[in-house]
């Protein structure tokens, strides 16, 4: 492995290896290339079959210990492409008993410049389709269930962290279910952009030194091998030069991360206490929260997810910078973009896989506590504003703030009992309309 040995000397040695899924994708590309080249009569059958078999072994992870180049290498990804070529060539030579050359045979009809951009797109698309979206669907289902379970649990609304009109807990959780549905639509749309791959573009997108039918044949084989709806890129020049589709996917990841961060922050606030915080929900935990304070239970899974979400947001900046690397015919941020985007997908998938069963499915509303807080909120006075006016309502609100009971303050202000009853019907206050102007009561 002459190239790989030299590469280890000149590339960085940070210990940052390519994700398993990218190596899987590279192995399948080499498999598809060998099969396509044989079908087009460009390579003898014995070598082609040996390369195909060795390539599948690489895809399956049997030679991961030999894929040793660092992510921080040449911007085209030539280092990892040649590392894989040399591993396959060595193994194919053993299988066939013939000399199999890493460039002449394994890399036939290819360049690092079309192979690695294709591999990182295939890897990311696969992870989104097969891992991230199912995990996200589980979170959405859990939020739907939680919203349904708490649809009649009234609690105080809060804006600016100050008392506001009452809402139901179900309304709050339904907001996040809807947000995740919209984020899912964005993620699904953007990841499908990755399915256009530049395989066959060779060095600069023209396809020089590749059979004219090679892209079609190779991508067809890859489509079957990966189970993804892959297509030859509408412009190989674009897909080799720009990483805009990966930037779009990372942006969708960022939206997911931000929505997740907000959900977790709200859960932490609602769980705060038990005696000096909101204490509106309980989340049974199975691990001690403090090494010093006995019996203290902290929202450990929630905080782990928030840290992962923060990392996803930060990694989006790396994707942005990686997309700017390069000039003219080729991006120079391909290895970094591949590594970082897969990392984002893994962080989100693992977060969702833990958030649904360990947090959302375990949330228990503290119904009486939440209702008590809602009934004692001075913001309830807002209901009377359409009748008594904003200024008079503000005076009553001030009296409540200074310690008077709501009912007492209303009576002293001359509010009729029927309006007081409407004001204190907090279930009604979580629905649209103008209760103070409604007949009856």
Predicted stretch roles:
Residues 2-441:
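Conserved, well-structured ligand/cofactor-binding cores
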């Amino acid at each position: 492995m002459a190239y790989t040995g030299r590469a280890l000397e000149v590339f960085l040695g940070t210990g940052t290896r390519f994700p398993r899924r990218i190596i899987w994708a590279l192995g399948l590309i080499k498999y598809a290339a060998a099969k396509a080249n044989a079908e087009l009569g460009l390579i003898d059958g014995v070598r082609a079959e040996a390369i195909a078999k060795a390539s599948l072994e690489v895809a399956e992870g049997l030679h991961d210990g030999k894929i040793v180049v660092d992510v921080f290498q040449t911007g085209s990804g030539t280092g990892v492409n040649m590392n894989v070529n040399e591993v396959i060539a060595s193994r194919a030579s053993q299988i066939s008993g013939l000399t199999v050359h890493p460039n002449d045979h394994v890399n036939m009809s290819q360049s690092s410049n079309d192979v690695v951009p294709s591999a990182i797109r295939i890897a990311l698309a696969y992870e989104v389709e097969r891992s991230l979206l199912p995990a996200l669907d589980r979170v959405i289902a859990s939020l739907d269930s939680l919203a349904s379970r708490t649809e009649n649990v009234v609690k105080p609304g809060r804006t600016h962290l100050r008392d506001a009109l009452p809402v139901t807990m179900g309304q709050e959780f339904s907001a996040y279910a809807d947000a995740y549905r919209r984020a899912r639509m964005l993620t699904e749309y953007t990841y499908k952009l990755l399915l256009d791959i530049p395989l066959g573009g060779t060095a600069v997108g023209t396809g020089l030194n590749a059979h004219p039918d090679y892209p079609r044949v190779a991508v067809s084989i890859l489509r079957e091998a990966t189970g993804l709806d892959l297509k030859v890129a509408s412009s190989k020049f674009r897909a080799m030069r720009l990483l805009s589709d990966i930037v779009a996917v990372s942006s969708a990841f960022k939206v997911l991360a931000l929505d997740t961060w907000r959900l977790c922050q709200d859960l932490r606030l609602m769980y705060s206490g038990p005696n000096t915080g909101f204490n509106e929900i309980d989340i049974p935990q199975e691990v001690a929260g403090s090494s010093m304070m006995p019996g203290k239970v902290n929202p450990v899974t929630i905080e782990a997810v928030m840290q992962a979400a923060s990392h996803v947001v930060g990694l989006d900046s790396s994707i942005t910078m990686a997309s700017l690397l390069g000039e003219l015919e080729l991006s120079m941020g391909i290895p970094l973009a591949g590594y970082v985007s897969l990392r984002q997908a893994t962080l989100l998938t693992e977060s969702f896989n833990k958030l649904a069963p360990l947090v959302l499915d375990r949330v228990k509303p503290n119904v009486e506590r939440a209702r008590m807080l809602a009934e004692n909120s001075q913001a309830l006075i807002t209901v009377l504003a359409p009748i008594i006016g904003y200024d008079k309502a503000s005076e009553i609100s001030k009296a409540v703030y200074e310690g008077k009971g709501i009912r007492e303050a209303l009576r002293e202000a001359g509010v009729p009992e029927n309006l007081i009853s409407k004001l204190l019907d907090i279930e009604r206050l979580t629905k649209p309309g103008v209760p103070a102007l409604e007949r009856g009561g």
